[in-house]
Each structure stands twice: as structure tokens, then as C-alpha cells.
């Protein structure tokens, strides 16, 4: 059904699953090391209901292209990738084919950054 596709479709981080680290820290995803809480201090339910986790369940909060995309309820983009590139889990997913303009901008930004590397680093 459409409802099931929209629920299961795309990334399940913070919507269908969460990651639990060995010491009890809960993150929305293994690729998003943002600690939301710790099971030694709070219940899983309280962590799951944290406002930060709600960002993953409410796709109407998505920004940029992902927020306007007709597939946002089926896809939703990778929230970890958005966070790692922009520092915001609600930002557009730069890896999405429908978001190619943003991807080109990121590539241009990377080319403008000049990194000095010591030749000793490769010996």
C-alpha cells in the first residue's frame, strides 16, 4: 500500500531503527554519530521520543530540494550524509540524483580548498 511504502521507503534512521553503541549511547544511525541519549541514564522510549529523533520521522521538516521533492515520503534522502556535509539532518541530501545542482556546488567548493601536504607524510 502507499502508506506502507511511505513508512518503509528510504532511510529508516530514527524512524524504524536506531544504533546502540556498546556503552549504551543511542544514535539515529551508525553513520550519524550524534548521541541522542544513553540507555544507562534514560529509557529507550524517552530517547526515541527526543525532539532530535522527531526530525527523522517528520519529513515535512526537510529543507531545500528534499523538502520540495515529490518522493520525500518514499525516499527522504540520507540524513547522515546531509548532516556530514551541512551539519543539519534536515538539509538536502547532496548525493541524490535529483539534487545534482547542490552536488556540483559542493564539488566546486572542494576544488577551491587548497590543502598543503608535507612530502614526509607519504614516506
Cite the ranges covered by each PLM segment.
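C-terminal accessory region of radical SAM enzymes
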Residues: 1-2, 25-76
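Short, small/polar residue-rich loop motifs at catalytic or cofactor-binding pockets
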Residues: 11-15
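Short, acidic, Ser/Thr-enriched surface-loop or helix-capping motifs
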Residues: 20-21
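Cysteine-cluster motifs in flexible loop/terminal segments that predominantly coordinate metals
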Residues: 60-106
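Short flanking/linker segments adjacent to small metal-binding domains or redox-active Cys/His motifs
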Residues: 76, 115-123
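Ligand-binding grooves and catalytic loops that recognize ribose/phosphate and carbohydrate rings
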Residues: 112
Amino acid at each position: 500500500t502507499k502508506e506502507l511504502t511511505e513508512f518503509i521507503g528510504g532511510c529508516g534512521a530514527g524512524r524504524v531503527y536506531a544504533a546502540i553503541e556498546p556503552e549504551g549511547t543511542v544514535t539515529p544511525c551508525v553513520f550519524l554519530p550524534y548521541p541522542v541519549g544513553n540507555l544507562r541514564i534514560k529509557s529507550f522510549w524517552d530517547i526515541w521520543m527526543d525532539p532530535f529523533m522527531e526530525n527523522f520521522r517528520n519529513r515535512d521538516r526537510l529543507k531545500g530540494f528534499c523538502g520540495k521533492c515529490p518522493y520525500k515520503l518514499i525516499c527522504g534522502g540520507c540524513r547522515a550524509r546531509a548532516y556530514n556535509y551541512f551539519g543539519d539532518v534536515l538539509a538536502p541530501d547532496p548525493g541524490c540524483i535529483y539534487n545534482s545542482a547542490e552536488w556540483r556546488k559542493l564539488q566546486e567548493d572542494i576544488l577551491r580548498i587548497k590543502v598543503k601536504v608535507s612530502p614526509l607524510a607519504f614516506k
